[in-house]
């Protein structure tokens, strides 16, 4: 019979139980009681998620999709591959050790973090050196298998594959080629798979999403010998590709000595023919037809029509699946009592998507009539969504159609603008600033919760937030920062805040997804044409500016990031939606400028994240992404300084496009990479001003002034002092004030030291 399965389920819990358990554990100093509570929470979440999968009608549950912090880090823990610099005993690894690698400790900074392919999930980057070894690691996966079997479930295990694990890492300490470590890594995987077979696991899903990339020949050539070494003695192996088209590797993948393949038909439907043609008789083909990355309800009839010919060709060897892990969507639509009822009928979260997979399996096996009610409901929802009047705004469509190339460019060149801005602001060499947000304290959260619950009225809430702005301004003046921010106390999230104020967006109550570790985000839903009904940030920025003679930046989230960090409508091109958002932000920048705000930051941390995985598709994306930013930023006068911020980005390959944004100042995250990101600036003459991050805000570790001074001096080797800013890596929302106070005081001290050295080195 055709098998229904998913590639993974969200691990955070319907009420973010894992987040809160992690934070309690860290807050309690990793005590024995806190660890027991955390372990119990993880066990309960896994049991609940498997229950959802079973009750939906899936043929197996997935184990190994759970991780305490990150599934790449967990895979490293399973194969004894955590960075040697931490000095851990791989076979006796504790949770405290695991979290030290993720978050850093007093002796070592945290592992670097970057985006998982083109998603908004962040993984911890493996560190590989000539001395790297692999071997037996933690028992967590086997514990999960035992848990699932004890609950009566048929378990399919899931692992990040060896090729992907190596690809995702960075070579260090003279290692020339990561593939040189493959002969050491394969035996560790082989032993892991053999143990899974001994534990009674029939199938193991091996995630190899790198086969959706443009792979070098050496990596392609490594695939067959790797899986020839893994297959003997292992359970049946299902090699899973996702996130893009893997058809250029179809012949290679079909020839692997494995029991099945998985392909993503949501992101790359056209690849199906390349896989079905001459498909080996000894393999299953898992078709990812239910979207694992977006929240829109599946058009079941359309999906059934797509799968029926595959069933006719392959029979029971067709498996029905989600396109990728459901890690990227919220847990359960049932927890959205306040969402608009019509909109709700258009949606499916992880729990609903598991049922969509099973319903498609049932229709393929028993016929559509067996699940007619579910199919009819889905068809009605799809029809209503196509025709709903709430989606279309003729005014917005006219404004987008009227845009010209000139609307996306500043009136004057950077050199002219820079002179006007120097005259207006009179900033010192190496000006210091922050990225935007300050700690979201318990006081802020209590006030927001009281306001949402109706306990605190609107005026009371505004005064509470104004008090937090006053605190933020006073602290920044005490540190001695040159350019200030208002601290964003009123914002629960840099995208959701704007989504609440823009037409065409909807906000969920509990639509949380994991960004990294305990960090969760609640992406808005972009369901219709986007329009700005009234100013969003002017009041807060104006109030903050009234408290200081120093410039205060207005803070906006850019159009591409708004798009990337939302669940976006799929009934029009993403480029069109980006332009709609850009027009709304353009109006906001003009309103800020009119109110006297002279610096406006338009954050685009997700610019590179949106880059297509295929090189051939990138130029078109960058064209519309740069245009959207230009539309948002280019209406202001020469002496209004436009800032932008990017984080977690390795963007050497897109520096020309970043330069084309023509922001007066760009800040980037560089601390964890020890300024390696700036290597690209040695060969590319970036024309505008830049602030490489000198303080890793993702770790509780507080740097001292000497450490920050060293980073500033490293940056000066690549960036002229006249164009260098000093700032943290990212916003400070997740840190505590005691950490921020110490770190920013050290940052200002370090900047003053270096400023003095630079000025003394310049002849009078």
Swiss-Prot record:
L-homocysteine binds at residues 435-437, 488, 603. L-methionine binds at residues 435-437, 488, 603. GO terms for molecular function: 5-methyltetrahydropteroyltriglutamate-homocysteine S-methyltransferase activity; zinc ion binding. Its cofactor is Zn(2+). Zn(2+) binds at residues 645, 647, 669, 730. GO terms for biological process: methionine biosynthetic process; methylation. Binds 1 zinc ion per subunit. Its EC number is 2.1.1.14. Disulfide bonds: none annotated. InterPro entries: Cbl-indep_Met_Synth_N, Cobalamin-indep_Met_synthase, Met_Synth_C/arc, UROD/MetE-like_sf. It comes from the Bacteria. Pathway: Amino-acid biosynthesis; L-methionine biosynthesis via de novo pathway; L-methionine from L-homocysteine (MetE route): step 1/1. Keywords: Amino-acid biosynthesis, Metal-binding, Methionine biosynthesis, Methyltransferase, Repeat, Transferase, Zinc. Pfam families: Meth_synt_1 (PF08267), Meth_synt_2 (PF01717). CDD domains: CIMS_C_terminal_like, CIMS_N_terminal_like. 5-methyltetrahydropteroyltri-L-glutamate binds at residues 16-19, 115, 519-520, 565, 609. PANTHER family: 5-METHYLTETRAHYDROPTEROYLTRIGLUTAMATE--HOMOCYSTEINE METHYLTRANSFERASE. NCBIfam families: met_syn_B12ind, PRK05222.1. HAMAP family: Meth_synth. Belongs to the vitamin-B12 independent methionine synthase family. Catalyzes the transfer of a methyl group from 5-methyltetrahydrofolate to homocysteine resulting in methionine formation. This is 5-methyltetrahydropteroyltriglutamate--homocysteine methyltransferase. The gene is metE.
């Amino acid at each position: 019979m055709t098998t229904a399965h998913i590639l993974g389920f969200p691990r955070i819990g319907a009420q973010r139980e894992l987040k809160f358990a992690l934070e309690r554990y860290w807050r309690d100093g990793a005590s024995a009681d806190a660890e027991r509570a955390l372990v119990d929470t993880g066990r309960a979440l896994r049991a609940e998620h498997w229950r959802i999968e079973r009750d939906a009608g899936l043929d197996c549950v997935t184990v190994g999709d759970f991780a305490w912090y990150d599934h790449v880090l967990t895979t490293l823990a399973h194969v004894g591959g955590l960075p040697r610099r931490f000095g851990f005993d791989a076979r006796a690894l504790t949770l405290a050790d695991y979290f030290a690698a993720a978050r850093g400790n007093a002796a070592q900074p945290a592992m670097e973090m970057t985006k998982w392919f083109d998603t908004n999930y962040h993984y911890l980057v493996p560190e590989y050196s000539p001395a790297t070894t692999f071997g037996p690691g933690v028992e967590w996966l086997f514990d999960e298998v035992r848990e699932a079997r004890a609950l009566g479930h048929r378990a399919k295990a899931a692992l990040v594959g060896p090729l992907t694990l190596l690809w995702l890492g960075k070579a260090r300490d003279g290692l020339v080629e990561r593939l040189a470590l493959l002969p050491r890594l394969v035996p560790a995987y082989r032993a892991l798979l053999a143990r899974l077979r001994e534990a009674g696991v029939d199938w193991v899903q091996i995630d190899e999403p790198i086969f959706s990339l443009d792979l070098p020949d050496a990596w392609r050539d490594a695939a067959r010998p790797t899986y020839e070494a893994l297959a003997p003695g292992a359970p049946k192996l299902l090699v899973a590709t996702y996130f893009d088209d893997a058809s250029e590797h179809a012949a290679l993948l079909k020839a692997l000595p494995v029991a099945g393949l998985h392909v993503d038909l949501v992101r790359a439907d056209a690849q199906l023919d390349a896989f079905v043609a001459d498909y080996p008789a000894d393999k299953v083909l898992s078709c990812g037809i239910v979207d694992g990355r977006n929240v829109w309800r599946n058009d079941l009839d359309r999906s059934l029509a797509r799968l029926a010919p595959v069933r006719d060709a392959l029979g029971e060897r067709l498996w029905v699946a989600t396109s990728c892990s459901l890690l990227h969507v919220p847990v359960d639509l049932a927890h959205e009592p306040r969402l608009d009822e019509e909109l709700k009928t258009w949606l499916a979260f992880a729990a609903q998507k598991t049922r969509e997979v099973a319903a498609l399996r049932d229709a393929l096996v028993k016929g559509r009539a067996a699940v007619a009610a579910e199919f009819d409901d889905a068809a009605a929802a799809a029809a209503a969504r196509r025709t709903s009047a709430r989606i279309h705004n003729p005014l917005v469509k006219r404004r987008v159609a009227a845009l010209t190339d000139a609307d996306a460019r500043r009136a004057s060149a950077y050199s002219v603008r820079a002179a006007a801005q120097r005259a207006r602001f009179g900033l010192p060499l190496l000006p210091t600033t922050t990225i935007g947000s300050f700690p979201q304290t318990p006081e802020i959260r209590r006030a927001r919760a009281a306001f949402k619950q109706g306990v605190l009225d609107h005026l009371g809430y505004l005064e509470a937030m104004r008090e937090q702005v006053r605190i933020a301004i006073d602290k920044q003046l005490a540190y001695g920062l040159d350019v200030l921010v208002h601290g964003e106390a009123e914002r629960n999230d840099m995208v959701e805040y704007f989504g609440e104020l823009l037409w065409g967006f909807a906000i969920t109550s509990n639509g949380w997804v994991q960004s990294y570790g305990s960090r969760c985000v609640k992406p808005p839903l972009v369901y219709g044409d986007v329009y700005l009904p009234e100013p969003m940030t002017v009041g807060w920025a104006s109030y903050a500016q009234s408290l200081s003679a120093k410039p205060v930046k207005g803070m906006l989230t850019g159009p591409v990031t708004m798009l990337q960090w939302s669940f976006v409508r799929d009934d029009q091109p993403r480029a069109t939606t980006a332009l709609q958002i850009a027009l709304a932000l353009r109006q906001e920048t003009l309103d800020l400028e009119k109110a006297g705000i002279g610096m406006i930051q338009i954050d685009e941390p997700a610019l590179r994240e949106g880059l297509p995985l295929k090189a051939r598709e990138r130029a078109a994306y960058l064209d519309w992404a740069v245009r959207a930013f230009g539309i948002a930023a280019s209406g202001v006068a020469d002496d209004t300084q436009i800032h932008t911020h990017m984080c977690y980005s390795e963007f050497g390959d897109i520096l020309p496009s970043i330069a084309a944004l023509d922001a007066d100042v760009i800040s980037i995250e560089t601390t964890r990479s020890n300024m390696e990101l700036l290597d690209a600036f040695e060969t590319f003459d970036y024309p505008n001003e830049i602030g490489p991050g000198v303080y890793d805000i993702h770790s509780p570790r507080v740097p001292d002034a000497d450490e920050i001074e060293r980073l500033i001096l490293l940056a000066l080797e690549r960036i002229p002092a006249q164009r260098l800013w000093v700032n943290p890596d990212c916003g400070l929302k997740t840190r505590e004030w005691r950490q921020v106070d110490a770190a920013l005081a050290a940052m200002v001290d370090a900047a003053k030291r270096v400023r003095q050295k630079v000025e003394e080195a310049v002849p009078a």
